[in-house]
Amino acid sequence: MGKVTQEQQVIEVLREKGGYATLRSLNQLVNVSNWTTKTPDASIRRIVQNSKYIFKIRPGLWALEEYRDYVLAKFDLMPGDRKSEERFTHGYYQGLLVEIGKYQHHLTYIPPQDKNRLFIDRPLSEITDSTELPPFTHEDLLRKARTVDVVWLNERSMPLGFYEVEHTTDIKNSLTKFYELQDFNAGFYIVADVSRKKEFEDKLHVSMFAPIEKRVVFLDYDRVVHTYEGLKLVDGSIW
């Protein structure tokens, strides 16, 4: 029996995980003690990107080709079906934002209507701290804040960051929410594919949004994924 290759090690871990895993999980689970490289995380990244036995579900989320049908069915993900693609993508990035927030020791919130949406294979309600916002302001503003995709709160239950995931929906709607919430000492973030950045800038740079223009940050999907993958390296401000 020949020596087990690095690729075979990664594939075996994927099998043990049910056929799929995040790159962050692979970095933690693959036994690299016998690897001679000084950058095993980079090696694992190259393996999943280049192996014909592995395919990308979403940035940072990989699966075995032999498990393709099983994995896509498990995630209720039908390639080419806009509704299922939107649902999975939205839940995936909400979940990443929740996980990043929790790693930073923030309290995390997602709207109650999203509690059954999946983050990979778990309902968002299982990973977030709450689906109910604390009463940090009057009801009119709370009602607006409750619709934000992800909210980070500090230890005093005050908002630190408002995140809106914009896969296909109108970015202006999220900017309007942020405008209404501008009096809080919190960050405002639009999370979307990099292809929507110009649209974001065009809609932000109008007179109505001048009060928040310098406070709203565009986070592309890859930046969120890379932050999640490198959480062990995070120290202080992450964006």
Region locations from a protein language model:
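Nuclease catalytic cores
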Residues: 44, 73-112
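Active-site metal-binding core of divalent-cation-utilizing nuclease and nuclease-like domains
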Residues: 80-86, 102, 109-157, 229-239
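Charged low-complexity interaction tracts in eukaryotic proteins
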Residues: 2-7, 33-79
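Catalytic cores of nucleic-acid endonucleases
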Residues: 128, 134-148, 154-220
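Charged, structured surface patches that assemble and position nucleic-acid processing machinery
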Residues: 208-239
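Positively charged, polyanion-binding regions of nucleic-acid-associated proteins
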Residues: 1-24
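A short acidic, leucine-rich amphipathic alpha-helix
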Residues: 25-30
